[in-house]
């Protein structure tokens, strides 16, 4: 039996961010491999009129948990939903619930965070820094706690080219920022934000770096580890390939490309697309939880889980495979034929944005106005391009992450644990993974039926023919206008026609002689 799976048996586990993508996959893996665990505490808020228990049932109703229900039929009884608001002091947890958490928790997986690149500094600091600090304070009062696993990001120090598995200091102490945000008004905060984040590309990466500093400073005598995943993507193997449930990161790009809205991106084609499957991240998290609790390292260890240094795939290769998959399994009702042009040149990027994005959106909105409908495409396109622009920093660069601790941990696992909790990204077949990724977006995000593929292919063929006809008509009109205005253009045109006529005459004469 797996040593790691046995370790989590009988444990009480606290997961923050359990309703998010990573948190759901973590819960699924825990229940599937360690169905005899005692309880999983999840911190949630009522949402859209739902009670806490209704939110739990909604999570378990997902296809993701189908296998879990077979091995752990009473799974809903092992999830203890606790009302909490990470924006409030002490998370607004009731005294009774707090007492239960403090007295029973064995393992903490801190996954909660705001991942918005354009979030306000106040909100991002509250969730990514202050909440982490408060959770560490809670952890220090848990007598049965064995390990605290903090999930950060590989891009927390993206202002560096080479990133080691260490915690880097930030220019300003987290405590000073937390204290200053309590009395500064929003206008002043917005004004000083660019000066604070300095070389970091956005507030998200900056506050995740601050969060790591807080972990280091507030660790006390706790057994703590930090995990830094890169771009978290769809499942690779477990519980099945291609599962995804949000439109963040690559998922939104795949949808926008497959629907024909996004046809050109400012990106360096040969830059590494450092995508890491979510189940690989979860397997490392569980292995790190076991290792931290059992071996009790003297210092806080940092683990990188990235693909670029072990099994790199560049954006060009990924784009080619995504388009090839769209040919086989296209999305339904695309706006235009899917395409993906990568360019690192700013002028070329602006040209493609004007020709491939804004112009079609304006034309379509004119059509909507003429037919008495409300124009919406230009607004949607502007929002899409604004979102893509926030990703440009990451798709135009490559980083080097050291993975000494991750490789060390892999070597510490038994063959059975390496199989059950596989986080060896060197085994990943990118072509197969990308195809399953696109298929998963179609099935689980867009909720499109596979039976509709033949009809979608017909529509794609129709759009391709329209594209060719439009380009041909545009060329002929432009050429006709050019001929009418330029003697040189007329001479070139007559030369081409004359040459073609002579070539055809020669070919016909040659055929006659052979006969």
Swiss-Prot record:
Segments on the Peroxisomal face: 485-515
Segments on the Cytoplasmic side according to the record's topology features: 1-464
Catalysed transformations (reactions): a long-chain fatty acyl-CoA + 2 NADPH + 2 H(+) = a long-chain primary fatty alcohol + 2 NADP(+) + CoA; a very long-chain fatty acyl-CoA + 2 NADPH + 2 H(+) = a very long-chain primary fatty alcohol + 2 NADP(+) + CoA; an ultra-long-chain fatty acyl-CoA + 2 NADPH + 2 H(+) = an ultra long-chain primary fatty alcohol + 2 NADP(+) + CoA; hexadecanoyl-CoA + 2 NADPH + 2 H(+) = hexadecan-1-ol + 2 NADP(+) + CoA
Enzyme Commission number: 1.2.1.84
Membrane topology: Single-pass membrane protein
Record field: transmembrane: 465-484
Root EC class: oxidoreductase
GO BP field: long-chain fatty-acyl-CoA metabolic process; wax biosynthetic process
Entry keywords, A to Z: Lipid biosynthesis, Lipid metabolism, Membrane, NADP, Oxidoreductase, Peroxisome, Transmembrane, Transmembrane helix
Alphabetized InterPro entries for the sequence: FAR, FAR_C, Far_NAD-bd, NAD(P)-bd_dom_sf
GO molecular function, one term: alcohol-forming very long-chain fatty acyl-CoA reductase activity
Compartments where located: Peroxisome membrane
Keyword Transmembrane: yes
SUPFAM superfamilies in alphabetical order: NAD(P)-binding Rossmann-fold domains
Source organism superkingdom: Eukaryota
Any Gene Ontology CC annotation: peroxisome
Main function: Catalyzes the reduction of saturated but not unsaturated C16 or C18 fatty acyl-CoA to fatty alcohols (FAls). A lower activity can be observed with shorter fatty acyl-CoA substrates. Can produce very long-chain and ultra long-chain FAls, regardless of whether they have a straight or branched chain. Involved in the production of ether lipids/plasmalogens and wax monoesters whose synthesis requires FAls as substrates.
Protein family: Belongs to the fatty acyl-CoA reductase family.
Record protein name field: Fatty acyl-CoA reductase 2
The organism of origin for this protein: Homo sapiens (Human)
